[in-house]
């Protein structure tokens, strides 16, 4: 095999890899940039309910039937209202609206067709008030939390009719403040984010918000960082995982102590990792989604990375380039064998199997395989006495 042929084959393989990465992220065609952030504290989210995907957009609540590939998006409620999140109780929906200075919470009894404002009173500095995020109790639909710039974390046990303050503190950056309940231990509440001097933190209450423990430098990454939305192992409730700025945080003792995997020096694993999720069927498989802004000659991009050992190590990320300066990831969910990524540009569907296959594929010389290893072409057909070209041997792409 001469040098020119080798170079041609390698270029073809690189082109094949780039094309495969582009095809991995399948846009669901929302039709408008509904995920665009409306301001510094805007965090639009999405939810999977049965076979339906509900997405909070700048123009209201939209839904898509995930069981039908060609289903159209439908506006289902809160038309023209910039939404960040919602909680559902039967036909009742409590929606978190993006706004400045008031009118944050909207209650509907008919799925969002009509609604009334139920925002609690804002005693002081109303013009500075924001409600960045909302969290629903995993088993009690009447119980939920919202975060408030001026009042801290508020708890309601009657679906938003009345509120009490759990703590007056939330982290300083409203665009990266996350609150929630532990899904298996809902008496555990967290507030993660970024402090006043940009250090990463997570505050945890183990007694339903009565007392709080702060974890900052103990996370293993002192200095400029942020702890984004935590996720929880489905069968080991002591294991939590959260993305950071170029790193991944992991705990195996219910949030008491943390370790940090720092990937800032590794281009294949570095990103602002915002959302992560354990696989429903294979709990030691974890997915994490993030993004990078435009830098020099490189455009903005969305990144997706996976781990098959519970988050202790990660395969190189798969990348989708974007025309946007910064295509921020708003949320990550799963539906069966697919991941759903909500970014500022669209909602994307990604096959879990294809993601893992592309992440674990490596290029190596055929001489490292045994003579008994069968070769397949790129269409999956077995090849006897393969000639010069690109083949799949032992589940890896090989240049021969």
For the regions a protein language model found, what residue spans apply to each?
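Blade-level signature of beta-propeller repeat domains, shared across WD40, Kelch, NHL, RCC1
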Residues: 325-359
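Repeated scaffold domains used in trafficking and secretory/extracellular systems
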Residues: 39-47, 80-88, 127-135, 174-181, ...
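Short glycine/acidic-enriched loop and turn motifs that connect beta-strands
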Residues: 60-62, 98-102, 151-152, 194-199, ...
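C-terminal tail/sorting-segment detector
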Residues: 3, 390-400
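An edge-strand/N-cap motif at the start of beta-rich repeat modules
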Residues: 20-69, 73
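Conserved Ser/Thr-centered positions that define the repeating blades of beta-propeller domains
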Residues: 63-67, 108-109, 138, 156-157, ...
């Amino acid at each position: 095999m001469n040098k020119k042929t080798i170079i041609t084959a390698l270029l073809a393989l690189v082109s094949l890899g780039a094309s495969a990465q582009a095809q991995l992220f399948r846009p669901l065609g929302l039709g408008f940039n509904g995920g665009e952030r409306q301001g510094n504290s805007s965090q639009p989210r999405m939810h999977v309910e049965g076979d339906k995907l509900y997405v909070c957009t700048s123009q209201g609540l939209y839904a898509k039937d995930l069981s039908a590939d060609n289903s159209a998006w439908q506006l289902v409620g809160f038309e023209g209202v910039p939404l960040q999140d919602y909680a559902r109780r039967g036909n009742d929906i409590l929606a978190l609206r993006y706004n400045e200075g008031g009118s944050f919470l909207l209650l509907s009894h008919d799925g969002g067709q009509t609604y009334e404002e139920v925002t609690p009173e804002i005693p002081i500095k109303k013009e500075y008030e924001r409600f960045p995020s909302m969290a629903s109790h995993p088993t009690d639909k009447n119980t939920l939390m919202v975060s408030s710039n001026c009042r801290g974390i508020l708890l309601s046990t009657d679906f938003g009719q009345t509120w009490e303050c759990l703590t007056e503190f939330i982290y300083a950056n409203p665009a990266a403040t996350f609150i929630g309940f532990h899904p298996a231990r809902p008496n555990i509440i967290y507030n993660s984010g970024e402090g006043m001097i940009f250090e990463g933190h997570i505050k945890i209450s183990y007694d339903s918000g009565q007392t709080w423990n702060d974890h900052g430098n103990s996370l293993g990454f002192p200095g400029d960082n942020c702890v984004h939305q935590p996720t929880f192992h489905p069968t080991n409730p002591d294991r939590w995982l959260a993305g950071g700025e170029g790193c991944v945080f992991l705990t195996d003792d219910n949030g008491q102590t943390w370790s940090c995997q720092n990937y800032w020096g590794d281009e294949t694993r570095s990103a602002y990792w915002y959302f992560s999720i354990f696989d429903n069927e294979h709990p030691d498989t974890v997915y994490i989604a993030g993004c990078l802004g435009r830098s020099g000659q490189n455009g903005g991009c969305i990144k997706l990375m996976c781990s098959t050992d519970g988050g202790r190590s990660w395969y190189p990320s798969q990348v989708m380039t974007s025309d946007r300066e910064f295509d921020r990831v708003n949320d990550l969910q799963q539906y069966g064998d697919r991941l759903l990524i909500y970014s500022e540009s669209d909602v994307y569907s990604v096959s879990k199997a294809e993601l893992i296959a592309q992440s674990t594929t490596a290029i190596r010389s055929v001489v490292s395989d045994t003579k008994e290893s069968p070769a397949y072409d790129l269409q999956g057909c077995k090849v006897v006495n393969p000639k010069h070209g690109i083949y799949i041997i032992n589940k890896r792409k090989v240049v021969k």
